Amino acid sequence: MSYQKKQPTPQPPVDCVKTSGGGGGGGGSGGGGCGFFGGGGSGGGSSGSGCGYSGGGGYSGGGCGGGSSGGGGGGGIGGCGGGSGGSVKYSGGGGSSGGGSGCFSSGGGGSGCFSSGGGGSSGGGSGCFSSGGGGSSGGGSGCFSSGGGGFSGQAVQCQSYGGVSSGGSSGGGSGCFSSGGGGGSVCGYSGGGSGCGGGSSGGSGSGYVSSQQVTQTSCAPQPSYGGGSSGGGGSGGSGCFSSGGGGGSSGCGGGSSGIGSGCIISGGGSVCGGGSSGGGGGGSSVGGSGSGKGVPICHQTQQKQAPTWPSK
C-alpha cells in the first residue's frame, strides 16, 4: 500500500503594491507641497500644508496628506480633503482644502502632517500634532507623529507619548514633536532611534534627521518614520518629514522659508528636495512636478513544497 503525501498547491507570491510614481508638486497658493511617502502623488493645499500620508494605511490624501495612522484610509479630518480609504494604495489627487490643513488637524492654516493623535494644530503651516498632545501653533512645525496606531505592519516610530509635543514651536520651525515653544525646539521625538535634529528657529529649518530602516512586516508601502525631521521652514513653512527606508532624510533639507511647503521624502527616494520658498512647493517640486518614483515595498512569501514520501 503506497502512501504519498499530497503536495500543497503553490500559491503565487503576495502582490507587491507599487506606489504610484511622480507626485510631488505642491499646488495651491503658498505651496502645500507634500510629497507622498513611497512616491505617491502630492498636491499641496494653500497656505502651505506640508504633509504626507501615514504609512500603513494606504491612501493618498494628496496635498493634505492627512494620512490616517494604521490601516484604513479615510480622508483626514479637519479640512483634509483627499484620501480615499484603501488598504495599501495611494490615490493620487486629494489635496487639502482651505488652508491645507493636515489630516486630523482641527486648526486653521496649513497643518502639516498626519498624526493619529488628537490635538489639532493651529496657525499657519504647523507640522504635526503628536498624539495626545496639543498641536503646534504658529509657524511651521516639523514632524509628523503617529499616535498609538502608527503605521500598519511596523513599529510606530516618531510617536509622542502623552503629548510630548506640548506646544510645538511658535514662530519659526520646530522639530518634530518639539516640546516647548520658541524657535525650533529640539524634537522630543521618542521611539525609533534617530531623533530629529532640532528645528531651526526662524529662517529655514535645516535639521533633518537620519532616517531609520524599519523591518517590513507587511506588503503595504511603509515609510518608516525613523526619524522625524525637525526642520520646519521659516515663517509659515512646515518642516519636512523624512521617512526611513530608502530615501533616508536626504532632500528634506529644511523646509522652505515663506508660507510654505515642507517636503517629505519617501521611503523609496526623495520626493521633494528641500521644499521651495513661497508658492509651489514641496514634493519634488520644482515647478510642482514630482520626480519621486514609487517603489514596490512588500514581502514575497517564499513557497516551500512538502517532501514527497516514497512509495512503499
Swiss-Prot record:
Q: Where is this region: Disordered?
A: 1-27, 276-312
Q: What does this protein do?
A: Major keratinocyte cell envelope protein.
What are the alphabetically sorted keywords of the record? Cytoplasm, Disulfide bond, Ichthyosis, Isopeptide bond, Keratinization, Nucleus, Palmoplantar keratoderma, Repeat
Question: Which Pfam families is this protein grouped with?
Answer: Loricrin
Q: Where is this cross-link: Isoglutamyl lysine isopeptide (Lys-Gln) (interchain with Q-212)?
A: 312
Q: Where is this cross-link: Isoglutamyl lysine isopeptide (Gln-Lys) (interchain with K-89)?
A: 154, 216
Cellular component GO terms held in the UniProt record: cornified envelope; cytoplasm; cytosol; nucleoplasm
Q: Name one GO biological process term.
A: peptide cross-linking
Biased-composition ranges, Gly residues, are 276-293
Q: How is it modified after translation?
A: Substrate of transglutaminases. Some glutamines and lysines are cross-linked to other loricrin molecules and to SPRRs proteins. Contains inter- or intramolecular disulfide-bonds.
- The name of this protein is Loricrin
Say where the cross-link Isoglutamyl lysine isopeptide (Lys-Gln) (interchain with Q-154) occurs: 89
- The Polar residues compositionally biased stretches are 299-312
**Known InterPro entries for this protein?**
Loricrin
Q: What is the disease in the record?
A: Vohwinkel syndrome with ichthyosis: A variant form of Vohwinkel syndrome without hearing loss and associated with ichthyosiform dermatosis. Clinical features include palmoplantar keratoderma, pseudoainhum and ichthyosis. Compact hyperkeratosis with round retained nuclei and hypergranulosis is observed on skin biopsies.
Provide the cross-link position: Isoglutamyl lysine isopeptide (Lys-Gln) (interchain with Q-213).
312
Q: Cross-link Isoglutamyl lysine isopeptide (Gln-Lys) (interchain with K-312), residue numbers?
A: 212-213
GO terms, molecular function = structural constituent of cytoskeleton; structural constituent of skin epidermis
User: Where found in the cell?
Assistant: Cytoplasm; Nucleus, Nucleoplasm
Cross-link Isoglutamyl lysine isopeptide (Lys-Gln) (interchain with Q-216): give the residues.
89
